[in-house]
Amino acid sequence: MKLTILFGGASFEHEISIVSAITLKEKLSNFELNFIFCDQDHTFYLINASKMRATTFSRGEYKKMPKLTLSHGSFVQKSLFGSVDISGTVLNLIHGGDGEDGTIAAILDFFSIKYIGPRVDASVFSYDKRYTKWLCHARGVKCVESQELSSSEHSNIKIAYPIIVKPSRLGSSIGVSIVKDESKLDYALDSAFEFDNTVIVEPFLEGVKEYNLAGFSAGKKFYFSIIEEPQKEEFLDFEKKYMDFSRSGNVDSAEISKELESKLRASFEKVYKNLFEGALIRCDFFVVNGEVFLNEINPIPGSMANYLFDDFGGSLKLLANSLPHTKRAKVTYEYIHSISKAKGK
C-alpha cells in the first residue's frame, strides 16, 4: 500500500510530529511510504526515507530537499523536466495547530486529496477542550466539570482545590499545571495564558483509574484497539509525553471487567459516530466509582497509537479503503447558459 505521511506543521507540537513520523517509518516498513514535511513557514518538502532522522530537521537539512506544491488530487514535485504527482493516501500526522485544528483537513479537502485524519468539523470539536465538553453533553457522554477563564478573569476560580489548569487548545501537557492551593495559582495561569487566550480549569481527580482506547470505523463497523491503563503518575509532563510519542512496541491490555470494557467502547462510539469517520483517534478516559468520564479526544494520537493495535498496518489499510466521500457540487453553468440564450447571445 502507498501511504504519504504528512508531518511537521507550525505548532508547539512540531517536534512531537517529527518523532511520530520517524517512529511510523519503522513500524510501517512493509508499506510504500512517502514523507512530506511541513515547516514552520508552511512550505512542503519531500523527504527521502533515508533522511528520516531528527537531525535532518533540527539542522535545517530538509531545506535542500524538493519543495512541493498542491494540485487536484495530490502533492506535486515540479522540475525542469515536468512534474510528478506524489501518489498514495495521505496520513495527517501533524499534531497540534495546523494538523488538529482543521487547517490541513481544509487544504486536503479543497484539493480533493484522500487522507486519513479528522475532517474539519471533527477537528473543531476535538481541538478546543471547551467544544469537546459541549460534544459530550450533546451525546450523553460524561466529562469532568470545568470552568472557562479568559485573561481578564485571572483568578476568579470557583472550583475547589486541587485543580488542574490547561490551555483550551493544546495537547501533550504543554502549559498544564496542577495547583494544590491558591498560592500557586497565578504562576499556573500565567503559564497557561502563554499558549492560549482561554484556559480551562478542572478539579484534579486523585485516585482515579485512567484508560486509553483507540479505534476507528470502517464499513459501518467499529474496530477497537486494546484498552491501555497508562503508567500511574500524578502528572505526565511534556518531556515524558514526548518520549511516549516514540513508542512502537505493543503494550499489555488492561485487566478490566467485560462490563467496563463495554462502557468504554460505548462512550467511544458516541464520541466518534457521524463526526470522526476517516480518522483513527484515541480517547482518554477517567473511571470514578465505575462511571466513565471522557478526559480528552486525541484526533491524531502520538505515533497514531500504533502500540495499542495487534495489527496496526492492517488497521490503516482497512481505514484507507473506507474513507468518507464528500459530495461535491457539479458545476454546469446551466444558469448562465439559460440567461445568455434568453438574451440571444
From Swiss-Prot:
It catalyses: 2 D-alanine + ATP = D-alanyl-D-alanine + ADP + phosphate + H(+). GO terms for molecular function: ATP binding; D-alanine-D-alanine ligase activity; metal ion binding. Disulfide bonds: none annotated. One of its GO terms (cellular component) is cytoplasm. Its EC number is 6.3.2.4. Pathway: Cell wall biogenesis; peptidoglycan biosynthesis. ATP binds at residues 160-211. The keyword Transcription does not apply. InterPro entries: ATP-grasp, ATP_grasp_subdomain_1, D-Ala_lig_Van_CS, D_ala_D_ala, Dala_Dala_lig_C, Dala_Dala_lig_N, PreATP-grasp_dom_sf. GO terms for biological process: cell wall organization; peptidoglycan biosynthetic process; regulation of cell shape. It holds the Pfam family Dala_Dala_lig_N. Mg(2+) 1 binds at residues 284, 296. Keywords: ATP-binding, Cell shape, Cell wall biogenesis/degradation, Cytoplasm, Ligase, Magnesium, Manganese, Metal-binding, Nucleotide-binding, Peptidoglycan synthesis. Its cofactor is Mg(2+); Mn(2+). Signal peptide: none annotated. It is found in: Cytoplasm. It is an enzyme of class 6 (ligase). SUPFAM superfamilies: Glutathione synthetase ATP-binding domain-like, PreATP-grasp domain. Mg(2+) 2 binds at residues 296, 298. Belongs to the D-alanine--D-alanine ligase family. Cell wall formation. This is D-alanine--D-alanine ligase. It comes from Sulfurimonas denitrificans (strain ATCC 33889 / DSM 1251) (Thiomicrospira denitrificans (strain ATCC 33889 / DSM 1251)). The gene is ddl.
